[in-house]
UniProtKB/Swiss-Prot annotation:
Gene3D superfamilies assigned to the protein according to its UniProt record, in alphabetical order: 1.20.1280.290
InterPro entries according to UniProt: SWEET (IPR047664), SWEET_rpt (IPR004316)
MF annotations from Gene Ontology: sucrose transmembrane transporter activity; sugar transmembrane transporter activity
Species, as recorded: Arabidopsis thaliana
Protein known as: Bidirectional sugar transporter SWEET11
UniProt-annotated stretches for the region Disordered: 266-289
Gene designation: SWEET11
Amino acid sequence: MSLFNTENTWAFVFGLLGNLISFAVFLSPVPTFYRIWKKKTTEGFQSIPYVVALFSATLWLYYATQKKDVFLLVTINAFGCFIETIYISMFLAYAPKPARMLTVKMLLLMNFGGFCAILLLCQFLVKGATRAKIIGGICVGFSVCVFAAPLSIIRTVIKTRSVEYMPFSLSLTLTISAVIWLLYGLALKDIYVAFPNVLGFALGALQMILYVVYKYCKTSPHLGEKEVEAAKLPEVSLDMLKLGTVSSPEPISVVRQANKCTCGNDRRAEIEDGQTPKHGKQSSSAAAT
């Protein structure tokens, strides 16, 4: 009995620490949304991370309702659902119409359609411990997909030998969070809570190791300038997509200026070759007037 009480005590300690760290992670976008509220525009930010976070918190909250003695798992995911709903509501209020429509489609497809399908199937087709196992398996699968997202960043760091796109503080926080929730899952002997955090800890530790290795490196000595830019292409493309709805006039004006310069060079080349420049009569009449 003493061993059982000790395990519950450790589960409470790790669960409480996990709640505190996860609260901080959930609140980290507050400055971003304060700026959105103040400027009344989303400035090209995307809603995908918040829609995914809401779906993840909803799944884990549903899993927690099927288990006993996991109150701290309920509290953090209930808070996650609450705060992510606020973020998404603010995004919908200030986003341009295309981004707003995309967000609504994702919410209907993933958060409403996907979750309702899981809820109905699990409630009517399976019962008892089997239901908790199936929901836990779904949560693990989704969490593994979310944890695998930083792999593209890790690839970029290795290829460019630059940690520009991998903040150390965020990697450290997420690694500590994964360790705490891993210990919480082990204390509860819950493989569905523990397993995805093993992967989260491994990826977080790898990111910190890469940060130490490449901290003072800017670019790879084995990569040319074009290859470095190619390695950064996903981030650059994302930035271009985000800025496309806000600053489209600038690229257009640049293209026009480039066309003017090209036309000017063509005219000079024609004059040097002794050919009559195109639009010569129009230019003369304009000069005469």
